[in-house]
Each structure stands twice: as structure tokens, then as C-alpha cells.
């Protein structure tokens, strides 16, 4: 899980979600997991 100021989709399989006011990017590739912080 990468914690970044600006999260974005890296590939076509990435999905952007908003959980409890925090932007999260999930993907089948675990390297693409990101959280806004």
C-alpha cells in the first residue's frame, strides 16, 4: 500500500474508491494499491 498525496489509476484494472472520506485505489496488481494521506 503506497500512501500518496495524489492517487491515480496506474493501469486499466485499477479501481478508485472513496472509503470514509479517503481516496483508495485497488488493483489485481498489489503494487498498484494506493491510499491518499
Curated annotation (Swiss-Prot):
Domain of life: Eukaryota
Keyword Plastid in annotation: yes
Keywords associated with the record: Chloroplast, Plastid, Ribonucleoprotein, Ribosomal protein
GO biological process: translation
UniProt-recorded Gene Ontology molecular function terms: structural constituent of ribosome
Location of the protein in the cell: Plastid, Chloroplast
The keyword Chloroplast is assigned to this record: yes
Main location: plastid
One GO term describing the cellular component: chloroplast
Recorded family membership: Belongs to the bacterial ribosomal protein bL36 family.
Name by which UniProt lists this protein: Large ribosomal subunit protein bL36c
